[in-house]
Design a protein with these regions (language model features):
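Non-catalytic interface/targeting segments
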Residues: 1-12, 67, 72-80
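A C-terminal functional module that forms or caps the active site or interfaces directly
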Residues: 10-48, 52-57
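A structural signal for small-residue-enriched, beta-sheet-centric alpha/beta enzyme cores
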Residues: 88-94, 238-248, 252-318
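Active-site rim loops that border cofactor/substrate pockets in soluble metabolic enzymes
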Residues: 1-22, 293-313
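Anion (oxyanion) recognition and catalysis
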Residues: 43-46, 157, 276
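Conserved active-site and cofactor/substrate-binding residues in soluble primary-metabolism enzymes
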Residues: 36-40, 68-72, 91-99, 154-160, ...
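Generic N-terminal targeting/processing segments that precede catalytic cores or assembly contacts
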Residues: 84-241
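General beta-strand structural signal in soluble alpha/beta enzymes
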Residues: 9, 28-29, 54, 176-178, ...
Length: 318
């Protein structure tokens, strides 16, 4: 084998010192990108006048599909091998809205129109969502992405989630405005400003980060709308949570797990939080609408928010 005394171990950011010690006539390196310190090696060799041979990374054949992590891998398998998983995964309204923001911002900055918008999930993984529509309106750009909830029984599945982006020189923030079909917060306890749009904190952070990638400073107004959201909201927990006139833009992980028990239990937690914020000292758990009507008659002094339906999750509710 190769003589052990001729092996010199690589130390990050010590390329020039290594080459000074070895004094090679040439170096051979592979195209390894940032993680392999490719650029640093090349720059150090050039400064010393050392000949460089780089093994170029081969192009992937069309049959290869790059993925950025477990979410992308699962989505690719679901697409290529239908039925491999019993239920398809999907994306939250927060991720969907963020994709619309990315596409609109890209166009607003004069960078053209995207067929798919890359979005960074809270986990750090990059996923891409197809853009359904993009257009310019005077001083704004409007983009729409269709919500894909996978096989989760989500009332928003297939609905257009739209983002309207405007630059606003009158302030320096990324500001969120209520659009058609997005609810307005009317009660405390959700961690959102009363009177503001029902856009949860994680989606706000996701959208803000994507805007600042392309527009580091200056005011930006983001209006999220869901044209069918007002009607869909009547089939959600929003009326109980004090969210009126539309749905919420939600999502903690950015991904919808099919038939997610987490979403139901999360809604129960929010209801309890609101009841507590309104000063309720007692919570009445009940199985559904019929039993709730009965217990409301038994406890007429309690506020409406003190009555919480547990569905199939009585243990989690307790």
């Amino acid at each position: 084998g190769f003589p052990a005394e001729r092996i010199v171990f690589f130390e990050p950011h010590a390329d020039e010192e290594l080459m000074q010690a070895v004094r090679p006539d040439a170096i051979i390196t592979k195209e390894s990108g940032e993680s392999g310190y490719f650029r640093e090696k090349i720059e150090a060799a050039r400064r010393m006048g050392i000949r460089i041979y780089a093994v170029v990374r081969p192009s992937l054949p069309p049959s290869f599909i790059p993925v950025g992590g477990p979410v992308g891998l699962r989505r690719a398998v679901e697409r290529l091998v239908p039925g491999f998983f019993s239920l398809r995964s999907g994306f939250t309204t927060g991720t969907t809205a963020t994709a619309a923001v990315v596409a609109a911002m890209h166009r607003l900055m004069g960078l053209g129109s995207l067929a798919e918008a890359p979005v960074e999930l809270p986990s750090g993984e990059i996923v891409s969502l197809p853009i359904a529509e993009i257009r310019e309106e005077e001083d704004a750009v409007v983009s729409a992405v269709l919500k894909d909830a996978g096989d989760d029984p989500d009332v928003t599945n297939g609905m257009a989630v739209c983002a309207t982006i405007r630059l606003n020189p009158e302030h320096e923030e990324v500001r969120f405005l209520q659009g058609e079909g997005v609810g307005v917060v009317t009660l405390p306890g959700l961690g959102l400003e009363v009177g503001g749009p029902a856009i949860n904190l994680v989606p706000r952070r996701m959208m803000t980060a994507e805007v600042r990638r392309l527009y580091a400073q200056g005011g930006v107004d983001i209006t999220i709308s869901v044209p069918e959201g007002r009607e869909a909201a009547t089939q959600t927990f929003n009326p109980r949570l004090g969210i009126r006139d539309g749905i919420s833009i939600i999502g903690t992980s950015g991904v919808v797990k099919p038939f997610s028990a987490e979403a139901f239990v999360g809604a129960i937690r929010k209801q309890v939080g609101i009841a507590t914020a309104l000063g309720a000292n007692h919570i009445v758990l009940n199985s559904g609408a019929k039993s709730e009507r009965y217990v409301k008659g038994a406890y007429p002094a309690l506020i409406p928010q003190a009555f919480v339906q547990y569905g199939n999750f009585v243990g989690e509710s307790l």
